[in-house]
Design a protein with these regions (language model features):
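Non-catalytic interface/linker regions that flank or bridge core catalytic/transmembrane domains
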Residues: 1-235, 440, 447-482
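Histidine- and acidic-residue-rich, metal-dependent catalytic cores
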Residues: 161-482
């Protein structure tokens, strides 16, 4: 039962055998209806089937079998699982994502539909309960196995949906503030400070560093979700990524360790001035024109102006936002100031902003491997563009932060479970503790295997797995990772 794919194959074969079995309820599950989402259709059919089998409603096709206690207990369990599945299928985010043209490419929706397929088989198995108690008990073994799989899959679905809803909510909260400021509306920073506290708490709990991304033209998280002006959500995702990085390094800086909220809030607000750059410009895969580049280079100063004008007590934040693209050697923008002229908070933002940007995809390039991104930031610091202290704080994230999906030198795939304490040990970056998820040929491992690569005889981290490859290999089993 641990190998869900194998189980689904057996279910498919079993379903074919059941097609010829006389049914208690004819056509309990309609084939298709353009007006009713398939997940809701199956759920309603399954509920009706269970009610009829357990005698809650009358049926017209002869007497029902007398069910054993075990059969009734399993049907009661099935009803409980069905209620959870129906609730999941009715969530606005799931309904919205299911109605998108590319719904089949969404790992969570694909996973959900496979769960529905297992439930469908459960309906057919329940319909086939015979009169004989001994025969019922044999079928109960199969139904119990299916329900165990459904319970496990529902837990994964619910956990993945909760994470997505949290991501959607965080992006929307920032995007709403950015949109309001762009429309010359006064805003309070209480909601931003609350989000900053959440990110700091995530860092304290050593939760995985997850880089969020939306398209520049995106106006909502899913059809029917909260709508904001473009490119507010795209900018909000990058601001959150930068804030997550700062939340994890601020404790190492003597100046800001005692007041970590300010740097995280500054990171969350640093892109507000970019709202007047058209989404089409940010979505360009080709080089920018001189006018487009000039407009982008004005966004730090414009953001500082918006903060000063529309937010209260924001002078410190405004100074940091105005300088987060300045460089230590004077090659930055908008003012071209250098060295100590740049406030410390601006220099911290610059290092975290650069790292977060490199780790995220852009219309003109894919996301960089986290090791490459960190190396590039350290090189920029070595050449005097970024502050060395703040750049070196990023080493505490390791070349491969906890939660990264990685490919090993022998082709196996896993996720970083922990990094070694001595991050300066040259052997440590490529040899963390990894939870192995797939073999080199893409075969999924039934249960994650934790391996300390520093003690293993083979394998070291080769690279961060690209997003598309991650979805291809892991999406069907681990939608939360894809």
């Amino acid at each position: 039962m641990s190998d869900v794919r194998g189980l689904l194959d057996r279910i498919s074969a079993f379903r074919q055998r059941l097609e010829s079995t006389p049914r208690i309820i004819p056509e309990a599950i309609p084939i298709d209806s353009a007006d009713v989402p398939p997940t809701v259709r199956v759920a309603e059919a399954f509920r009706q089937s269970l009610r009829q089998i357990t005698g809650m409603v009358e049926v017209s096709e002869g007497p029902l079998p007398v069910l054993t206690d075990r059969a009734r207990q399993l049907l009661s369990t099935a009803q409980t699982l069905l209620a959870r599945q129906n609730k999941f299928a009715s969530e606005p985010a799931i309904l919205g994502l299911s109605n998108r043209n590319d719904a089949a490419n969404d790992s969570l929706i694909a996973y959900h539909r496979e769960t529905v397929a297992v439930l469908d088989c459960g309906v057919r198995l329940a319909q086939a309960f015979p009169e004989s108690p001994s025969a019922q008990l044999k079928l109960c073994d199969g139904l119990q196995g299916m329900l165990a799989v459904v319970a496990d899959r529902l837990a994964v679905q619910e956990r993945t949906l909760a994470q997505r809803q949290s991501d959607y909510s965080r992006i929307d909260r920032i995007a709403i503030v950015y949109s309001a400021m762009h429309q010359n509306q006064a805003v309070g920073l209480n909601s931003i400070a609350a989000l900053a506290e959440e990110l700091l708490e995530d860092a304290r709990q050593t939760k995985p560093l997850r880089f969020l991304h939306t398209e520049p033209r995106s106006t909502h998280s899913y059809p029917g979700g909260t709508e904001t002006l473009a490119p507010a959500r795209y900018l909000a995702a990058h601001a959150i990524n930068t804030a997550q990085v700062i939340a994890r390094i601020v404790s190492f800086d003597y100046e800001w360790a005692s007041r970590p909220l300010v740097p995280v809030v500054a990171a969350l607000m640093m892109e507000c001035g970019m709202m007047r750059v058209p989404a089409d410009v940010l979505a360009k895969p080709s080089p920018l024109s001189a006018d487009e580049r000039r407009l982008i280079e004005q966004h730090p100063q414009h953001g500082a102006h918006l903060l000063t004008r529309y937010a209260t007590d924001a002078a410190l934040l405004a100074a940091a936002v105005a300088t987060h693209h300045e460089r230590g050697d004077g090659t930055g923008f908008p003012a071209g100031i250098k060295g100590a002229q740049i406030p410390s908070l601006g220099r911290m933002l610059a290092a975290a902003d650069t790292y977060a940007a490199l780790c995220s995809p852009r219309p003109y390039r894919p996301a960089q491997d986290t090791r490459t991104a960190l190396t590039d930031v350290l090189l920029l610091a070595e050449h005097g563009q970024l502050d060395k202290d703040f750049a070196e704080y990023l080493v505490h994230l390791s070349f491969y932060p906890v939660g990264s999906i990685v490919e090993l030198t022998d082709g196996r795939i896993g996720t970083i479970a922990a990094n070694h304490v001595n991050r300066m040990d040259p052997r440590s970056p490529g040899r963390p503790i990894v939870a192995l998820l797939a073999e080199a040929d893409g075969t999924l491992i039934s249960r994650p295997e934790h391996v300390d690569l520093s003690l293993a005889t083979r394998g070291a981290v080769l690279r961060t797995l690209p997003a598309e490859r991650c979805k291809e290999v892991l999406g069907r089993r681990y939608p939360e990772l894809a």
